[in-house]
């Protein structure tokens, strides 16, 4: 038995066209389908299913029972070739489901690097997740959701299709998102998904200076506390953004919203 074979459990099933780096480990009763590529250092636990076309990067850990790269749960899907792309250093826990894209949605679902995707999380077709995100147990994304870097979804939270979640946002437990969430925003733990302030603690942990946090708070108050119509609030935020990259990011997010801003 060669060294690579010894890293693959004898009960695992590896399709002929799957491509595995020599040090990839595959657990018991796992199925690796056709057109799956898995890069070096990745560990696939027991009872996982990974369907292609799927590309998985380096040093990922699939703990067990995950269903990855399955067909999208979209009635418009007609069997067209679509794919799932997963980056490096992600941890994907038990019973996570991540679906491939659809032809009508760009054809790709993508997961970045260094994400922590916990048990029973569902990430639907055509979603795009950035880097360093956390999805707590039972978090769910409907189709076409875009999630920026450093976002945290608490347990049992979810996002409606086509929503965007800006960088450094925090989504509270049990919250249902039905609009775009601006960067840096904290969404309260209720089913209405109402903004409750900025994610101050998360920003501190990411080494934002007090001055940066104060500027973000000021922009938040302009948008959410001052009682201004959105058009007028955007004008004031634009003034604040002239010499501040964080506020420029916030303003650009607002101006490119495809769904109503969660407000």
From Swiss-Prot:
UniProt xrefs under Pfam families:
Acetyltransf_11, Hexapep
GO CC, sorted alphabetically, is: cytoplasm; membrane
What EC identifiers does the entry list?
A: 2.3.1.129
Localization per record: Cytoplasm
Q: Does the keyword Cell inner membrane apply?
A: no
An MF annotation (GO) of this entry: acyl-[acyl-carrier-protein]-UDP-N-acetylglucosamine O-acyltransferase activity
* Reactions mediated catalytically: a (3R)-hydroxyacyl-[ACP] + UDP-N-acetyl-alpha-D-glucosamine = a UDP-3-O-[(3R)-3-hydroxyacyl]-N-acetyl-alpha-D-glucosamine + holo-[ACP]
- Domain of life assignment: Bacteria
Pathway the protein takes part in? Glycolipid biosynthesis; lipid IV(A) biosynthesis; lipid IV(A) from (3R)-3-hydroxytetradecanoyl-[acyl-carrier-protein] and UDP-N-acetyl-alpha-D-glucosamine: step 1/6
The SS bond pairs are none
Question: What functional role does this protein have?
Answer: Involved in the biosynthesis of lipid A, a phosphorylated glycolipid that anchors the lipopolysaccharide to the outer membrane of the cell.
Sequence similarity: Belongs to the transferase hexapeptide repeat family. LpxA subfamily.
Specify the protein name: Acyl-[acyl-carrier-protein]--UDP-N-acetylglucosamine O-acyltransferase
Its lineage reads: Bacteria, Pseudomonadati, Pseudomonadota, Gammaproteobacteria, Lysobacterales
Gene from which this protein is expressed: lpxA
